[in-house]
Amino acid sequence: MRIHYLLFSFLLVLLSPLSAFSKKVYNAVSCMTNGGICWLKCSGTFREIGSCGTRQLKCCKKK
């Protein structure tokens, strides 16, 4: 039964980096790394995933 605890902890360690993708982007380099573009306003085919360092610039990514 102890192997179940080991496998469960191993699974948690493997899946924990996946939660990092749900965090907002706050600078232009992170925006481009995540496949986004810095624009003033996201158009209809794009969704906002964060900001590019200022309040005016939004990091937009295709839906």
Swiss-Prot record:
Signal peptide extent: 1-20
Keywords, alphabetical: Antibiotic, Antimicrobial, Cleavage on pair of basic residues, Defensin, Disulfide bond, Secreted, Signal
Annotated propeptide span(s): 21-22
GO annotation, biological process: cell chemotaxis; defense response to bacterium
One GO MF term: CCR6 chemokine receptor binding
GO CC term, one of those recorded: extracellular space
Compartments, as annotated in UniProt: Secreted
Keyword Secreted: yes
Disulfide pattern: C31-C59, C38-C52, C42-C60
Superkingdom per UniProt: Eukaryota
Main location: secreted
InterPro entries attached to this UniProt entry: Defensin_beta-like
KW Signal (keyword) present: yes
Described purpose of this protein according to its UniProt entry: Has bactericidal activity.
Family that this chain belongs to: Belongs to the beta-defensin family.
Protein's UniProt name: Beta-defensin 3
Organism: Rattus norvegicus (Rat)
